[in-house]
Amino acid sequence: MRNKHEYSVIDGGKAFRFTEGRLNHTLHQTARDTLTALGHAVKETVIEEGYDKDAEVEKWLWMDAVVWQMPGWWMGEPWTVKKYIDEVFTAGVGENKLVANDGRHRVNPTEGYGTGGLLHGKKHMISSTWNAPIEAFTREGDFFEGAGVDGVYLHFHKANEFLGTTRLPSFICNDVIKNPQVERYLADYRAHLEKVFGRG
């Protein structure tokens, strides 16, 4: 993606039990600051600080792409991120802004499911943090059976794609508790953002 664009960055970091959410907050801030430095317009949402669902719908209409930042909890996103999706996406359906319908037609009700989104041309990207090593995602016979990071997040991609967006390359930080390498994570993430989004 090149030339100046408008991006929404959503921080799904969450303080809970033994985690304070600091790494995810830092990665979110890195995305915000890097995209701004590249010359793009950026709006941010920190889910833990609260949000107005109607204002969030307007951000989805405004943006060219959204960057989701979140930890991997129990093989998926935190409940606060799912709550955001349920509230904001549903608000956009009710107002016929994000989704018109489920894409099917009475003439052929078995075809076209998931094609009724109104955000065609927009994109989404996942940035996540996991204590699992990358091999747990990619290696055949390992925990995720070779599904890969995007395979584990298929449901999340599909929630976004139901709106009409298409996916950008995902980013993941691994071993974040067992062997944290924060400076490397941040350097790798900046490089990833620069490669995916480019300078405005």
Residue ranges and their predicted role:
Residues 2-3, 24, 137-138, 142-200:
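Glycine-rich phosphate/pyrophosphate-binding loop and the adjoining helix
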Residues 54-156:
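Helix-loop-strand module that forms the ligand-binding subsite of alpha/beta enzymes
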Residues 34-39, 116, 122, 159-168:
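A structural motif corresponding to the C-terminal end of an alpha-helix
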Residues 8-10, 43-45, 67, 125-127, ...:
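Hydrophobic/aromatic beta-strand patches that form the interior of the parallel beta-sheet core
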Residues 50-58, 178-185:
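Structural motif
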Residues 2-38:
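N-terminal beta1-alpha1 ligand-phosphate binding loop
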Residues 16-17, 51, 133, 179:
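Flexible, glycine-rich phosphate/dinucleotide-binding loops
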Residues 38-51, 171-174:
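A short beta-strand-loop structural module common to alpha/beta enzyme folds
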